[in-house]
Every structure is written in C-alpha cells, then in structure tokens.
Regions:
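Transmembrane helix boundary and interhelical loop/hinge segments in multi-pass membrane proteins
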Residues: 86-104
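Cytosolic-side transmembrane helix boundary signature
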Residues: 261-289
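Extracytosolic low-complexity repeat regions of secreted or lipid-anchored proteins
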Residues: 366-441
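Aromatic- and glycine-rich beta-strand/loop motifs that create alpha-glucan
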Residues: 1-36, 273
Length: 441
C-alpha cells in the first residue's frame, strides 16, 4: 500500500517563508535601517541646541538618554510602523499571485491553512525584529549621547533611570497591539487584492485615516475605539499616578482588530479556488469591510456604556488639575537646579484657574485659546506667587503650556546644571488631560 501523503509541518513552512522574506533586498535594507538609523538620529539630535520641542519628550533629549527612544516611538507610531507593516505584511500573499507560484506551493505543502499560518508568523517575526531594532537602537543612541539620567515625566515628576527604563520598555511593548492590527489589515489586503497593490497600500491608508481622525474633536468613546489609539495612549505611563485606563483600552482594541482582521484573511484564503489561474482576490471586497465596521461600532458602544465620559473628555476641572500638578513638579525641579530650598508639592499647594477664549466660550474641548493662572505658596512667605500660562490643547488631551510671566518664574532663561545648561523647566512644558473620568485621591 502507498503511505498517505501528509502535509508539511508548519514549522518547516514557517522557516521556508522566513528565508523567502529575508531573501528580498527591501527586507534586508529595512532590518539594517531599523537597527542603525535610530541610534544615529537620536545621538545627533541630542547634541543639538535646537531640539524637536513639538515632539513629545523632545525638549528633554539633551538632558537624559531616555527621552530619545520616546521621541523615536512617537515618530514610529505616526510614520514608521504603518509603512513597515505595509511592506512586510501587505505583500506576503500578493507576491505569490504576481509570481504565479500558488500551485507549486500548494503541491509542496499540501495544506492551505498551514501556508497561511506560516506566512502570517513569518511576517510577525520580521515586524517584531524591526520594532525591536528601533527600540534598542534609539535607546543606545540616547544613552551614549545624553547619559543614563533621570527623566521628567509627562506631568513633570522625576523618574529615576531605572523607572524610566522600565516604562520606556512598556511603552514600546504597548504599541505592538496597534502594530499587529495594521499588520493584520495588511494580510487581509494582500489576500483580497491578489496581484494589485491593495495590501501594500491598505495599512498605510488606514493608519493615515485614523491619524487624521485623532485630530478631530471626536467623542471619547469613538476616539478610544480606534485601533491606533495605543500609539498615543502610552504617554499615560509617564504620569503619577499612571493613566492605565486609556492605554489598556487602546491595547485591547488593537488586539481585537488584529484577531478580527486575521480571521477574515484566513477564512478568505482557505476558501479560495486556487485552480482558477484568473483569480485575482476576492470579488466581495466591500462586504469584507463590514465585520470590521461592526467591530468598531460595537467597541465604541461598549466603551461608551462602560465609561461615563462625555464629549471630548477635556473639561475645565481636568485642565486646572493637570496644570497645577505639572507646575508643582517642575517648580521643585527648577528649585533644585537653582540651588534653592526644596519644598514639597503639598507645601506649594499649587492651584490653577483656567479659562478658554478669554472667558467668552465654555471652558471645554481642545484649542489654543486656553489661559491659566497658577497660584502657589512658599513656607514662611506671606505673599502668594502667581504665574500665567497660555495653553494649546490638542484633541487627544495633550497640551503645551507656554509661560507668559513673570519672567523670573516662567520666562526663558538658561539654568546651569551639572549636566550642562538647560532651559528653565517652567518656561514651556508638555502635559496631558486624561480623557476618561478620574478619581481624585
């Protein structure tokens, strides 16, 4: 009797697909770029006098090496990761259509599900290698250029180098969820598109659309239901207390999209008629989008029901609390740099009174017309200190506070520190408003 023909083990097919991916010049070039370019970029920028202050943690790049990988993370979430998922995952199935090698592959492997699993795992492996390269390289460049020093958090409190290292690692790990979502969308586009470049374009187009949506004043539930939200929610790791709620929701939504899009791609792939040489993707491409639309609607509904957040999530009380907290932390940092007596946040008892549009409009929502007056007390001093800030609040809750006097407190001047001259930390600072309701302790 003839022994039954068994499919090739998935591990062998996975190794074969991995070799095929690394055989292409573009993957080799991407690996080289991701492991070298971030270190060069971060090291070069950290030594400049003009820093990327419009980027989160950019103003701290020459003060600590832990700011560099966070600046790179912000760039990666906006530009690099969508493009990498397009190149790696968006073409893994379509390449076989262009080369006309599906029949040969099926004869060799004898299992469409194993081919799908191997290709998906090979793409995932390459993506993880690229993300790890950017994280390790940017961290190395930052530490070599600026040193292993304390990092000012997103609310101004100082993190020890050890705490900063742990949170930088967690931040990079957290963005794997939206990266997997984009990769799964790339797999789906590659299966759907056949010979067309749909798979290559789809992750980048979806990421661009979601990035544009994040700029709009969306309701909180809709914003958190976007699979790309974890690309910006990681900044909550650098506040005290940590803003875990939005980050966990963002990671969960990203993983849900990754599973849904991968399942759709798998079902379409295993049901494909490979005997039809004229087949060029699914004929029901529009209908395939419906499950993802339903997932988005269901996620937004669940978040809206589970959280009492209304509107944009940016309100007067939240802005005032955030500004007062950040000011108190940074005041202590400034006092230490100027060799003044240390005071605690409790002793300062900083408060903020904020208005929007000179008080002519309701104090809620994003905008660059926020104005805050911060007041504080020093032990043994009868007079109450005050300082004015102009705020530019974006739709995702992040804001830049620009000091508007008195110049002795929040004006621009250089402070001489053991690590070199640094701008007055109270002059300009970045912070954020947590969009979900918070419990005051």
């Amino acid at each position: 009797m003839t022994a039954p023909v068994r499919p090739v083990p998935t591990v062998r097919v996975y190794r074969f697909e991995l070799v095929k991916l690394f055989a292409t010049w573009r993957i080799r070039l991407l690996v080289l770029a991701c492991w070298l370019a971030p270190a060069v970029f971060v090291a070069a920028v950290s030594r400049q006098s003009s820093l990327p202050v419009d980027t989160l943690f950019g103003r701290w790049m020459n003060a600590t090496g832990w700011a560099g990988p966070l600046v790179m993370l912000g760039f990666a979430g906006t530009y690099a990761l969508p493009l990498l998922t397009s190149v790696v995952a968006g073409d893994v199935f379509a390449a076989e259509d262009r080369l006309g090698t599906w029949r040969h592959l099926l004869v060799a492997v004898r299992s469409a599900p194993r081919i799908f699993a191997a290709k998906a795992l090979a793409s995932l492996t390459v993506l993880l290698l690229l993300v790890a390269g950017m994280a390790v390289s940017s961290t190395a460049g930052g530490l070599l250029a600026a040193g292993n020093r304390a990092l000012a958090g997103f609310d101004g409190h100082l993190l020890t180098p050890g705490d900063a290292a742990a949170k930088v690692l967690l931040a990079w790990v957290s963005v794997l969820a939206p990266t997997l979502a984009l990769a799964a969308i790339g797999l789906l586009g590659s299966v759907l598109g056949g010979r067309s470049p749909t798979g290559l374009l789809l992750p980048a187009v979806v990421a661009l659309a979601m990035a544009l949506a994040q700029l709009l004043p969306l309701p909180v539930a809709v914003r958190l239901a976007l699979p790309s939200y974890a690309f910006v929610a990681w900044n909550g790791l650098f506040t005290d207390p940590v803003q875990l709620g939005p980050l966990l929701i963002g990671v969960g939504v990203g993983l849900a999209w990754a599973l849904a899009a991968t399942a759709l791609a798998y079902l379409l792939f295993v049901r494909r008629d490979f005997t039809n040489a004229a087949h060029d993707g699914s004929r029901r491409r529009t209908l395939v989008v419906l499950p993802l639309v339903a997932l988005f609607a269901a996620t937004a509904g669940i978040i809206a029901a589970a959280t009492p957040a209304l509107g944009s999530g940016i309100g007067q009380d939240k802005v005032q609390q955030s500004v007062a907290t950040a000011f108190a932390h940074l005041y202590r940092l400034q006092a230490g740099q100027l060799h003044r007596p240390d005071v605690t946040e409790a002793q300062l008892a900083a408060t903020a009174a904020c208005t929007k549009g000179d008080g002519l409009v309701e104090a809620e929502g994003p905008g660059n017309d926020w104005r805050c007056v911060v007041s504080w007390h020093l032990p043994g001093v009868a007079a109450t200190g005050s300082a004015v800030y102009q705020l530019d609040v974006t739709s995702d809750g992040r804001y830049v506070a620009d000091g508007d006097g008195p110049k002795e407190v929040n004006g621009y001047f250089q402070v001489r520190t053991p690590d070199g001259d640094q701008p007055n930390p109270l002059w300009q600072f970045d912070a954020n408003v947590e969009l979900l309701p918070t419990t005051k302790g």
